[in-house]
Amino acid sequence: IIMLGNVIVGQSGGPTSVINSSLAGVFKTAKDRGAKKVYGMRHGIKGLLDRQYVDMSEKIKTTMDIELLKRTPSSYLGSCRYKLPEIKDDKETYDKIFQILDELEIKYFFYIGGNDSMDTIKKLSDYGVLMGSDIKFMGVPKTIDNDLAVTDHTPGFGSAAKFIASTMKEIIRDGLVYD
């Protein structure tokens, strides 16, 4: 698939140790498939509403940059917990988002996160259909809770489970040092 047009990607919800790996994957795939520019939303959909975005194509130029991004802790682009209102309750918010996406010539919209992020993608996709937009909206699942419907597991869950298991092992070992 050739990606004609520009891409935008955002992160939301709690950070995991792998959220930036997902971001690196979206960026690399978009560039490999011909996307002109890959924009990153600063602080998720809330940042987009505030017109806070960066041209990631200017920041990530080499394979080493991508590898470093994969290993960067926390959320590289920043996060938010902002929930989009229902379309019927606040059409103006959606109009503003789509105006910004049109200005940036966005054809592909990726959002990395858990349940609320997937809800955001669904609402934007539904509004896009309603308005006749040709923007493709895709959710990239990431959650330490492993509670997304119709998924066996998500990136982030294994890291959290390993952390808890390692911590418990250390607590048990510490407890064994005393009589």
Q: Which residue ranges define each predicted feature?
A:
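N-terminal phosphate-binding or glycine-rich loops at protein starts, especially the Walker A/P-loop
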Residues: 3-53
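Short glycine-rich or small-residue beta-strand-to-loop segments that form or flank ligand, phosphate
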Residues: 6-16, 75-80, 107-113, 139
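Short, ordered loop/turn segments at secondary-structure junctions
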Residues: 12-14, 41-47, 81-82, 114-117, ...
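Short glycine-/acidic-enriched loop or helix-start segments at secondary-structure transitions
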Residues: 19-20, 50, 120-122, 149
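Short Gly/Thr/Asp-enriched flexible loops that form oxyanion-binding sites at enzyme active sites
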Residues: 21-26, 115-132
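Short, acidic/small-residue loops that bind anionic groups at enzyme active sites
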Residues: 38, 125-154, 161-163
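Glycine-rich oxoanion-binding loops at beta->alpha junctions
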Residues: 51-107, 116, 144, 155-169
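Internal, active-site/partner-interface "lid" segment
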Residues: 172-179
